[in-house]
Amino acid sequence: MKRSEVDRSKLSPMMKHYVELKDKYEDTIILYRLGDFYEMFFDDAEVVSHALELTLTGKSAGLEEKVPMCGIPHHAAEVYIDKLIKKGFKVAICEQLEDPKNTKGIVKRDIIEVISSGTIINANSLDEKENNYIGSLYSFGYGYALTYSDITTGEVYSVLINSASDVLYKLLSLEIKEIITNNEIDKALISKIKAQKIPVTIEEYYLTDKYLEVYENIEDDRIIKSIQLLLYYLSEVQKRNLSHFQKVIIKKDNSSLMMDIHTKRNLELTECLRTKERMYSLLWLLDNTKTAMGSRRLKYFIENPLVDITKINERYNVVSKLLEEFILADELRSDLYEVYDLERLCGRISFGSANAKDLLQLKNSLKVLPSIKEKLEKINYYDEIRPLNELYELLERAINEDAPNGLKDGFLIKEGYSSELDELKSLSKGGKDFISNFEREEKERTGIKGLKVGFNKVFGYYIEVSNSYLSMITDDMGYTRKQTLANCERFINPILKEKEDIILSSEDKIINLEYNLFVEIRDKCKEYIGILQNNAKVISEIDVLSSFAYVSEKYGYVRPILNSTNEIKIISSRHPVVENVLKDAEYVPNDIIMDNNTDIILITGPNMAGKSTYMRQLGIIAIMAQIGCFVPAEEASLPVFDKIFTRIGASDDLVSGESTFMVEMMEASRAIKNATSKSLILFDELGRGTATYDGMSLAEAILEYIANNIKCKTLFSTHYHELTEMEKTLPNLKNKHVSAIEENGNITFLHKVKDGSVDKSYGINVATLAGLPKEVIDRANIILKEYETKENKKTSSVQIALPLNFEEKKSVVEEELKKIDILNITPIEAINILSKLKEKVK
């Protein structure tokens, strides 16, 4: 039965109210509160019963036949809501606004909140180490304004974006969970956004009269419209209180180191390229934070490195001080461990969803703030914490340490906080003591040893007598039979009912008073949200810097020197993640030196020798330096880069489905169009996706353009040995190679980067290592000699890559090698595989 097909005039009043609500929330599943259940009807019931594997039943609604219905217990609603959100649904909560016990007729109900993928606030449904962004995209004809916010923390950011393709990359880079946009948006762009599994809602209204402080002093009307669009959706459609929203931060091109999503992924900053997980990323290595806020802030630091030398050096100074004061630093980290997620606690307090557990977490966090403040003063930290002793004392005085999660379950408020509450509890306790004494006295009065006093919600308090004693009951005892069971009968008497009324009345009053007192205390906490958010910011940042100090000491990192001469001098540099994964194996460090006369290093050498790792480690060291962390080297001096561009690996485009070669050219184009002399370019074997001479020609032309026009620091690896001749014509290009030793046809990678170009190719040696059959290798050597004798051939060898699907099996190691996808393997994965193979041949 479809809602659109029913005769609404025949519907019951309750069901008529439901369908009227559903008309307003067509794209949303409505959970309609009825007693102890949330129920769904019509299409919603059919969809949800299928999605959650619930029983589909029916409900009388005034029609000839029952309407489809399914339901979930209200106390378990969060679990079901979470499942629906993960399946892509939006959920509206229609709550009872009146107590059914005290209401005649239909209970008043209304939508109190709408939950979607971008507006989840349930802590159990969120990753505490990740932000959960919802964004609004405002199209203004020649570009876009994007505002995005994590409503659980109140952070708000805005950015202007030039093109539709950049919009897609930005949404993916920020991992935005949901987009709100206006009708002016290009329909093709909406389709592409939806193709990335990002829900899109079209909204045409703007909130202009509330939360003005969020965009106070912002003059750009495009950004204002984007903010107002988001505020309207969250406030008016999703019924959210946004009083905790902070002033918007405008993200500008020159405010931080610019990196596109390809650079972030190629350098494996926040997730491993292959597994798409944190493990083996830079974030994974550096995250020794003690708070959830600190972990989220670290990710923000990594994705937004600084470009202001003064601010970077401020961070260095704190890290240095923490390394000097190592005992204090250890005590500080112990204090930080006691701090809960203040940012998200503020969000729940603002939304009015904070429970007693949340306020206890707030209290315990406030308890350690004076100690943290004292330690920060000792290291001359540049931001200040306000301890809020008065709020701590209020929570300490008021909230019961063992308070339940439910706000209507009682036991929320401590004894001594409210005299009225204490009196009610005393009255209730007196009544319960009477009940306990009443049972003993009745046993003595009647001589019935098997007499018990019990309670249930149907009969209240009752006297239970087992069948074997029923003959002892006489009329003068004043017992009235209420229920007969298999083994006993239950009775009431006037004295018991009189006390029952007193007890139950006082218990209801206790629960209601405790609830009201708790709400008052929670509302009092709202007054401190601004200060709490500032404290959260300070704590999250010092948590990150203490993590930097911890890993710097643990792994032997050094403080970089940031120069203005545009020179790079990094002695014995290491890739921090690869070094960590190797563990007991010896990591081979390399120098990276580029003076004022060197803009480009052209790197040659065999596959798997370490070219990509060498390039990545420069990019990662630059980013570590600009987020304020010490770096893996014996000595490091480098400039502050404004942008980093990379092309490393053979992954296809993330959104357009273009070929590898097209993506290579698009990324090269993006780099040479946008790079400045202060940028860093890392290109790994550019041009390999097309024919040899095409690729070589393009690579040479791009190198010339960078050398003559951009003149920025560039690492460019290649398998085109002919390009090494460019050192003779481009004075700012230097050749380097990754060395290897060949003995008796076997190759050993030294992973050492040396001056000059490689003297030969090792393609056939690598193919031998990969386990190609001997007859293939022998034939390849014959063909190689034929190529080398050709007069016009410029290269000494051609690296070959043949499919590894031969059936010959010689050893377990060979079989494992055959499974390796050489073109798509990451350095970390290669190291792990080599380590396992080494164990097998021991």
Model-derived features: positions:
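Amphipathic heptad-repeat alpha-helical coiled-coil/stalk segments that mediate oligomerization
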Residues: 205-209, 258, 273, 364-433, ...
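Short hinge/gating elements
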Residues: 59-70, 157, 211-217, 268-270, ...
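Charged catalytic and DNA/RNA-contacting regions of genome-maintenance
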Residues: 1-321, 330, 334-337, 341-350, ...
